[in-house]
Amino acid sequence: MELVFLGTGAGLPSKTRNVSAVALNMTQEINEVWLFDCGEATQHQILHTNLKPRKITKIFITHLHGDHIYGLPGFLSSRSFQSGENQPLCIYGPIGIKEFVESTLRLSQTNLTYPITIKEITEDGNLFETNEMMVETKKLQHGIDSYGYRIKEKDKPGELLVDKLKQIGIAPGPIYQQIKENEITTLDNGSIIYRNDVLGPAKKGKVISILGDTRYSIDHIPFIKFSDILVHESTFTQDKELLAFEYNHSTNVQAAKLAKEANINKLYLTHVSSRYQAEDIDSIIEEARKIFPSTWLANDFSVYEI
C-alpha cells in the first residue's frame, strides 16, 4: 500500500506543483487504486507514474472548488480509451458533484464505455464497507462543504503456526489452507481444529486519514485519532495564521499541532500556496517538525509506503 501525490499545490498550478490529487495505491492488497480529488491535469500527472487509470475504481472528492475537480471530465473520458472499458467506477463527493459530472459529460457529448455511479455525501459517518476496507467521512470547516475521509484497512488473520500443526501431527499440504480459511476444520480422523488455536497474532490494518481544505479545529481530532497516516493541507506558514483563518485554510504548524493532539504516526503536508518557492521548503518542514517531528512535505510525484 502506498500514497502517490499527483498534485500538491493550492488554488492554481505552479511550475513545480499541480493542483490537488493524491492516489492510494492498493493494487497489492485489493487490486484497486483510489483517487482523492482530481484537480486540472490530474490525468497528465498519472502518465508520469506507474498508476493505471483502469485500476482507479473509486474517486473521493473533498469539495467542489475548481482546483479539486476540474480534472474529472478529462480523466473520466480518457479512461474509456485506457483499457477502462466495462471497469466500473464510483465517485463520492458533496452535493453538487453529480450535477457537475453529468453536465460536463452531457454538454461535451462524452459517452463513457464503463458504468459510473455517483454518490453524494449528506451526513457524517460510515460511507461504505467491504470485506477488506471501511471508509468514513466527516464535514470539515471550509467556505463550502468540505469533507475528510478516514480509510480503515481491516485486520488480517495472523500467520499459520506451522510448527504447532506439525507437533500435533498435521503434515504440510492443502489442509493448511483449509485450516486458515475456516473457523473450524474437521480432519479425516475426526479431530477438530479451531483456527484461532493455530494462528499467530492478527495483523493490524492501516488507517489513513485524508482531509480536504479546512481551518484548524480540535473537532477533527476524534475522526483522525490514532491514524497511521494523516494527509493535511498546509496552505500557509504560521506567520500567516490570520490569513489562513480568513480564507478557511490551515498553516503548517496547525497541521502539526493537530497531528500531535490526535496521536498520528506520520503527517504528510500538501496543498502548498504558490507564494512559497523552493527556498522556503526547508523552513516549512522545520516549523512543523518543532511541533510534530514525524512530518513530511509532499511534492508532486512523492511516493510513500504505508
Swiss-Prot record:
Binding site for Zn(2+) 1: H63, H65, H142, D213
UniProt xrefs under CDD domains: RNaseZ_ZiPD-like_MBL-fold
Cofactor note as given: Binds 2 Zn(2+) ions.
Organism per entry: Oceanobacillus iheyensis (strain DSM 14371 / CIP 107618 / JCM 11309 / KCTC 3954 / HTE831)
Annotated Zn(2+) 2 binding sites: D67, H68, D213, H271
Alphabetically ordered keywords of this record: Endonuclease, Hydrolase, Metal-binding, Nuclease, tRNA processing, Zinc
Assembly and binders: Homodimer.
Active site positions: D67
SUPFAM superfamilies associated with the record: Metallo-hydrolase/oxidoreductase
InterPro entries in UniProt: Metallo-B-lactamas, RibonucZ/Hydroxyglut_hydro, RNase_Z/BN
Cross-referenced HAMAP family: RNase_Z_BN
Pfam families assigned to the protein according to its UniProt record, in alphabetical order: Lactamase_B
Enzyme Commission number, as recorded: 3.1.26.11
Family statement drawn from the similarity comment of this UniProt entry: Belongs to the RNase Z family.
Catalysed transformations (reactions): Endonucleolytic cleavage of RNA, removing extra 3' nucleotides from tRNA precursor, generating 3' termini of tRNAs. A 3'-hydroxy group is left at the tRNA terminus and a 5'-phosphoryl group is left at the trailer molecule
Protein name per the record: Ribonuclease Z
Lineage of source species: Bacteria, Bacillati, Bacillota, Bacilli, Bacillales
Cofactor(s) needed for function: Zn(2+)
Record's keyword annotation contains Membrane: no
Any one GO MF annotation of this record: zinc ion binding
Cited function: Zinc phosphodiesterase, which displays some tRNA 3'-processing endonuclease activity. Probably involved in tRNA maturation, by removing a 3'-trailer from precursor tRNA.
The keyword tRNA processing appears for this protein: yes
